[in-house]
Each structure stands twice: as C-alpha cells, then as structure tokens.
Amino acid sequence: MAKRIGLFLEKVGHTAIFDNEGKRIPVTLLHLRDSFIISTKTKDINGYNAVVLGVESSVNIKKPQLKILEKSNITAKCRIFESRVDNLDGIVKGAKISITHFVENQYIDVTGYSLGKGFAGVMKRHNFKGLKASHGVSIAHRSQGSTGQCQDPGRVYKGKKMAGHLGSSKVTVQNLKVILVDQERSLLVVKGNNIPGAKGSYVFVKDAVKKSVPKNSFPVCTEDLKLDNIV
C-alpha cells in the first residue's frame, strides 16, 4: 500500500490505563494540534513527492517560515513540517487533518530527539565495564583504557567509542501499538513509555513500515474542514 502522510504530534506525558482483565498498561499521550496542508511537492519539480504541513504552535515562528505562511495566505502561527508520500492522490490544499488519520490497534513508528544528558563517560555512554576497583588501579576506575595500537597504525580509528555528548540524537522507535484514538481531545494513546523526547516536544508519527497499514485513505478536504484563513 502507498505510504500515507505522517503527522507531527506533541508529547503530553505518561500515564497508565487498565484493560478489561484489570491489567495495567503504561501508555504515552500524544496530542495533535490543528494541522492542515499548506502545499505539496512533486517528483517532477522537487525530485520527490511530499506534503508540507502546518501545525499550530504557541512558540515564536522564524521569519522564513512566516514568509511561507504569508504566501499561502495563512495568518495563524504555525510550525512547518514535511512528510514524504508515494503519491498525491486526494491531497487538497487547505485540508485539516484529524487524529482519526490513525486507528486503534494499528502499529506506528515514532521519531523524535532523545533527552540530552550532557557530557558522559564511556561507562554511562557505551556501557563499558570499567577498570578494576583495586589491585593497582589508581584514580582510573571509570577510564576506558587503551584507545588504539602502537606505531602502526599510529592513530585512533574513526568511530571509536569514547566519552562525549550523550543524548539529543534522532531516535526512531518502531512497532508501537495504538491503544486508543480520542477524537474529542485529539489525543493518540500509545502503548509503552519509550517514545523519545521531553514533554512538549514534537515527534513524527507514521504507519509502521514492518506492519500492515490501515485501510482508511488519505484525509479528504471538505467544506467544514477548511480553515477560514486559507484561500
């Protein structure tokens, strides 16, 4: 099936629910702010097919993004994202996308930026064992040890696991199950607490590439879904 639009949702936080058997299930809440289609990119012009999405935001918007919104006659403050698709059938400029784009019991892939943890040593960053706690080791218990060889090759190989910045990296978690779709609150309830990012951060949610895709089609623009400030 063709690749559908992926959406950018705000991470609200963690909680837990209980199923019919009384089993506790940890979940993560993702909120979809007002999202609509600003424009599209075609393979003939841009080299790939994509949908440019505007997501309502309360933070300050940079001038380049404001210019893009002005060209589309949009007065609302929106953050601009892009989602690649296989084809543009049924994509209409000005269509508002609902949280029902996803369905219950489907599987999704979530991409976000992990929490930054600053400069970390090799034991925390790469799970090194460390040196011995006694028997001659002095003030180097958490050291990484040797980093290379002798005169040949006389250098440290690229990609060597060493101390450095931990976190703040782009992470994708695959095959997360959608427990509930709350259309009234525009919430997506996802099983598990392993979605990357801090509270209030945006994550990219799309259909799981390793699981079956739901049969509902692309969102279709109707009169009641169009925003008033889009021409």
UniProtKB/Swiss-Prot annotation:
Cellular component, GO annotation: ribonucleoprotein complex; ribosome
InterPro entries named in the record: Ribosomal_uL3 (IPR000597), Ribosomal_uL3_bac/org-type (IPR019927), Ribosomal_uL3_CS (IPR019926), Transl_B-barrel_sf (IPR009000)
Tree of life domain: Bacteria
GO molecular function, one term: structural constituent of ribosome
Alphabetical keyword list: Methylation, Ribonucleoprotein, Ribosomal protein, RNA-binding, rRNA-binding
Free-text description of this protein's post-translational modifications in UniProt: Methylated by PrmB.
Keyword Cell cycle set for record: no
PANTHER family: 50S RIBOSOMAL PROTEIN L3 (PTHR11229), LARGE RIBOSOMAL SUBUNIT PROTEIN UL3C (PTHR11229:SF16)
Similarity remark: Belongs to the universal ribosomal protein uL3 family.
Function: One of the primary rRNA binding proteins, it binds directly near the 3'-end of the 23S rRNA, where it nucleates assembly of the 50S subunit.
Protein's recorded name: Large ribosomal subunit protein uL3
Organism: Ehrlichia canis (strain Jake)
Lineage, broadest ranks: Bacteria, Pseudomonadati, Pseudomonadota, Alphaproteobacteria, Rickettsiales
